[in-house]
Swiss-Prot record:
This is F420-dependent glucose-6-phosphate dehydrogenase 1. It comes from Rhodococcus jostii (strain RHA1). PANTHER family: 5,10-METHYLENETETRAHYDROMETHANOPTERIN REDUCTASE (PTHR43244:SF1), PTHR43244. It catalyses: oxidized coenzyme F420-(gamma-L-Glu)(n) + D-glucose 6-phosphate + H(+) = 6-phospho-D-glucono-1,5-lactone + reduced coenzyme F420-(gamma-L-Glu)(n). GO terms for biological process: carbohydrate metabolic process. Catalyzes the coenzyme F420-dependent oxidation of glucose 6-phosphate (G6P) to 6-phosphogluconolactone.
Length: 335
């Protein structure tokens, strides 16, 4: 299994210029990929940011030469028209051949209600149906042909994308449960999940579901890039490693809260009520490199080959330096 390392560019935490510089630093520190969150609103009102993901990708693309760039993740189904998303990614695919991927998910109310979604926030069944339809439409458009598409949610009439990269754009499907993970196995070029939810989720549900989906579609599961965002707060100062997780307290809210709360002020209020011990449970918090690697290893053993590291602290350059010095050599040794 070939191990790849990625950097999570946290658009909820850093402004546009700083976030671009961090992407450039990620390549300089040996990362193979950099993925960016796509939020219209951040998890936090105070101190939060939300630069536009696609502007970030093009800016970093111009200043790097080998880094794979993508979203983790974008929802191409509500505030975006999937045909326009397909056009945007096709353009980036032409500008940075072989380096662009589109990571997609079913969406959160936080980003869609503020931009005018009307009515009740849809249940998972509809959000998932929209996602499948959007992916199907985008892939048709990436063939470069004229597309007449009549779906339940989206429609095109004689639509063409005139500049498309050879082979289209790889689509990575984000999943937190087996239903979407099976879809990733059937249809995804890649699969995305996040760490810190109990190893049985990955070993007994997600990875078997990806394999099941691939088998039903007569695909080789080994050809699917299996990406996981590793939530890690590593610092040689143990107190700093723990305290750095505090900004990301919203990640420790329940799935229902994260998918239904549509106001960053309310999200921040709910998150700040959590004790630091509960916040830190979502993270690998370590000051010893061997301890950190020991906690990362089970994800590799589960078959996840593309590790994207999300560090919570404000000094991201420090994390990249420590990762390159302390963690990367040990992790590559596991391969």
């Amino acid at each position: 299994m070939v191990i790849k390392f990625g950097y999570k560019a946290s658009a909820e935490q850093f402004g546009p210029r700083e976030l671009v510089e961090l992407g450039v630093l990620a390549e300089a520190h040996g990362m193979d990929s950099a993925t960016v969150s796509d939020h219209f609103q951040p998890w936090r009102h105070e101190g939060g940011h939300a630069p536009f993901s696609l502007a970030w990708m093009t800016a970093v693309g111009e200043r790097t030469s080998r880094l794979q760039l993508g979203t983790s993740v974008m929802t191409p189904t509500f505030r975006y028209n999937p045909a326009v998303v397909a056009q945007a990614f096709a353009t980036m695919g032409c500008l940075y051949p072989g380096r662009i991927m589109l990571g997609v998910g079913t969406g959160e109310a936080l980003n869609e209600i503020a931009t005018g979604f009307a009515g009740e926030w849809p249940e998972f069944k509809e959000r998932f149906a929209r996602l499948r339809e959007a992916v199907a439409l985008m892939r048709e458009l990436w063939l470069g042909d004229r597309v007449d598409f009549e779906g339940n949610y989206y429609k095109t009439v004689g639509a063409s994308i005139y500049d498309v990269p050879e082979g289209g754009i790889p689509v990575y499907i984000a999943a937190g449960g087996p239903v979407v993970a099976r879809y990733a196995g059937r249809s995804g070029d890649g699969f995305i999940c996040t760490s810190g939810k109990g190893m049985e989720l990955y070993t007994e549900k997600l990875m078997p579901a990806v394999a099941e989906g691939a088998e039903k579609a007569d695909r080789d599961v080994a050809e699917i890039d299996k990406m996981i965002e590793i939530k890690i707060s590593y610092d040689t100062d143990p107190e700093l490693a723990l305290e750095n997780t505090r900004f990301w307290a919203p990640l420790s809210l329940t799935p229902e809260q994260k998918h239904s709360i549509d106001d960053p002020i309310e999200m921040e209020r709910a998150a700040d009520a959590l004790p630091i011990e509960q916040v830190a449970k979502r993270w690998i918090v370590a000051s010893d490199p061997d301890e950190a690697v020991a906690q990362i290893r089970p994800y590799l053993d589960a078959g996840l080959n593309h590790l994207v590291f999300h560090a919570p602290g404000h000094d991201q350059k420090r994390f990249l330096e420590l990762f390159q010095r302390d963690l990367a050599p040990r992790l590559r040794g596991l391969a």
